[in-house]
Swiss-Prot record:
This is Anamorsin homolog. Monomer. Coiled coil: none annotated. Belongs to the anamorsin family. It comes from the Eukaryota. The gene is CIAPIN1. GO terms for molecular function: 2 iron, 2 sulfur cluster binding; 4 iron, 4 sulfur cluster binding; electron transfer activity; metal ion binding. It is found in: Cytoplasm; Mitochondrion intermembrane space. It comes from Drosophila yakuba (Fruit fly). Residues 4-129 are annotated as: N-terminal SAM-like domain. [4Fe-4S] cluster binds at C209, C212, C220, C223.
Length: 248
């Protein structure tokens, strides 16, 4: 009872009326406050308001359906003290915890104490994690001072830096494109034709399938070069007279 000093309002729930006055006086002396009385069998019919008592003392622990009610009757951080309980203390402590009490402990072989949390049952509190910290650094934002810029000159190789031949940039005075018009009189048509003929002369000779010079392993079944050794691309190969005659 020494831990209950200073509690102003207490409720004593009794089962045996013998020496009841003596026990009540002991509780008053320990707390220094007022003590109300209630019979354990009348507890379910009582209509105490929520948060009415700082301390509730019970002589009997056979209240499996009343611990939640006692929790509501206590003020925040109020205490529940059980004496002369029946059954194992561990089982009773677990039952009290499941009813919402905290700091449940066994004071002695025949006494238990528990506390109501320091807030009212059903109360709520605003959570602070939704608040934005104005000074917080947005790590996803990239600072311009930390950017590594690519040197534009490194994107160009030596060929890109060479100036084009002005002769190859000549365009038709009529169309504005490097394509001669129908009645070209500026000389672009002749120039393009010369380039075309020069390109044809430099092209590598190719067969229809492009594999004749590689050898029989790459030639088609009707190739006239079947049976002949491989030759270099563009090399002149003379076919026999028998290959130039029709089989029919």
């Amino acid at each position: 009872m020494e831990n209950f000093k200073g509690l102003q309002k207490s409720l004593y729930i009794w089962t045996d009326s013998a020496d009841l006055d003596k026990r009540v006086q002991q509780l008053k002396s320990a707390t220094g406050g007022d003590v109300a009385l209630e019979n354990v069998h009348r507890l379910s019919f009582s209509s105490y308001a929520n948060s009415s008592f700082d301390l509730i003392v019970i002589e009997c622990a056979q209240l499996t359906d009343s611990y939640v009610k006692l929790l509501h009757m206590l003020k925040p951080s109020g205490k529940l003290h059980l004496v002369s309980f029946i059954g194992p203390a561990a089982s009773l402590l677990q039952e009290i915890k499941l009813s919402g009490f905290i700091n449940c402990r066994e004071d002695s072989p025949d006494a238990l104490t528990a506390e109501k949390p320091g807030y009212e049952t059903g109360s709520s509190a605003r959570l602070s994690f939704a608040k934005k910290n104005a000074s917080a650094v947005n790590v996803w934002k990239i600072s311009g001072d930390d950017e590594e810029l690519i040197d534009e000159e490194e994107l160009l190789d030596e060929e890109d830096k060479q100036k084009p031949d002005p002769a190859g940039l000549r365009v038709c005075s009529t169309t504005g494109k490097r394509k001669a018009c129908k009645n070209c009189s500026c000389g672009l048509a002749e120039e393009l034709e010369t380039e075309k003929q020069s390109q044809k002369a430099n092209e590598t000779a190719k067969s229809s399938c492009g594999n004749c010079y590689l050898g029989d392993a790459f030639r088609c079944s009707t190739c006239p070069y079947l049976g002949m050794p491989a030759f270099k691309p563009g090399e002149k190969v003379q076919l026999g007279d028998n290959l130039l005659k029709s089989d029919i």
